């Protein structure tokens, strides 16, 4: 992380696709995922660089533990109900979770609907749930941005 900070990174995102609560359960999630994520995150802190931690899978059993992660934002898979995450994580900055599958294979209306739902459910940063498929049509990404602009009255660069 220090090298990324030295290189001028504004944000560092850490993805942990296998450290999910549904696989590890609360005890092992805290012991392994939280402990080692925090070691990484604490090594990045320079007062300016922000951090995002993305974890795949269901989080229901580990909300208490995920709240111990020292990141600026928490990003979740599309299977995590954002309303539930918001209820359990309070004022934490939450990111996501527009379905990556829908962005690649769905239509514009589906993407717009999912984006609106994420906004209404309490996501602070709207983004694809688990990245962007290489064949995601530009029109679907544009639909996500247009919906976000409409829902949050946000000005986006042309």
Predicted regions located by residue number:
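Active-site loop segments of alpha/beta catalytic cores
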Residues: 1-158
């Amino acid at each position: 992380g220090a090298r990324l900070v030295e290189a001028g990174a504004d944000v560092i995102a850490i993805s942990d696709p296998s450290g999910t609560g549904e696989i590890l359960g609360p005890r092992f999630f805290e012991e392994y995922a939280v402990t080692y994520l925090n070691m990484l995150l604490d090594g990045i802190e320079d007062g300016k660089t922000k951090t995002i931690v993305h974890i795949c899978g269901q989080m229901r059993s580990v909300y208490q533990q995920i709240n111990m992660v020292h990141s600026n934002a928490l990003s979740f898979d599309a299977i995590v109900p954002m309303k539930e995450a918001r209820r359990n994580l309070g004022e934490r900055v939450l990111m996501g979770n527009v379905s990556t599958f829908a962005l690649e294979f769905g239509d514009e209306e589906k993407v717009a609907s999912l984006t609106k739902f994420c906004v209404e459910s309490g996501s602070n940063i709207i983004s694809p749930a688990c990245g962007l498929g290489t064949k995601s049509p530009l029109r679907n990404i544009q639909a996500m941005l247009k919906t976000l602009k409409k829902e949050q009255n946000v000005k986006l660069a042309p």
